[in-house]
A protein has these predicted regions:
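Phosphate- and other anionic-substrate recognition elements at nucleic-acid/protein interfaces
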Residues: 12-35, 41-42, 47-168
Length: 168
């Protein structure tokens, strides 16, 4: 598969006319990416897939109040097709209290970006796994407690789980 830079891709799309709508749709789908979100009340972790939709990469942790604008911009820059948001379930399968806020956020997101599909996936244990990844990576004790790192790695794990499920 050919991997094109987003700016080159956008230029190609602009030059295609209405007669080439099928080519446009195919090109758009092939070069799109997925976004993963570990939603939090104050801060949220964000991750992104490659254009082959096989690998997830932690992006950053941002203030949740700025999340919609951030997603809008990255959706334009990276041609985001699907946003995967973690679903916080307890061990007994009960829904965590944070779910109410996530549902409100998703409603706003769908109004703000109606052409982007939103998917949900169980996010149990992502924070614990993130902490173990950080420990194994050799990051010092002081930086291990940095919630910003944990959130973006958790977002990457959420997206990775979705990609594995989708590519089975």
């Amino acid at each position: 598969m050919i991997i094109l830079h987003v700016k080159v891709y956008n230029l190609i799309l602009k030059t295609l006319n209405k007669k080439n709508q099928k080519v446009r749709i195919l090109l758009n789908k092939q070069l799109s990416k997925y976004l993963g979100i570990d939603f939090g009340i104050k801060k949220s972790g964000v991750s992104i897939s490659d254009s082959n939709k096989l690998i997830s990469f932690p992006l950053e942790t941002i203030e949740t109040k700025n999340l919609l604008d951030y997603i809008r911009q990255i959706s334009i820059d990276e041609n985001i097709e699907i946003i995967v948001i973690g679903k916080p379930l307890k061990l007994n399968n009960e829904i965590h209290g944070l779910e109410e806020e996530i549902v409100k956020f998703i409603k706003s997101l769908k109004n703000y970006l109606p052409n982007i599909q939103v998917e949900r996936i169980d996010e149990r244990f992502t924070s614990k796994i993130s902490k173990k990844i950080i420990i194994k990576s050799g990051i010092g004790k002081k930086n291990r407690r940095d919630k910003l790192i944990i959130d973006k790695i958790s977002a990457s794990l959420i997206l990775e789980s979705y990609l594995i499920q989708k590519n089975k």
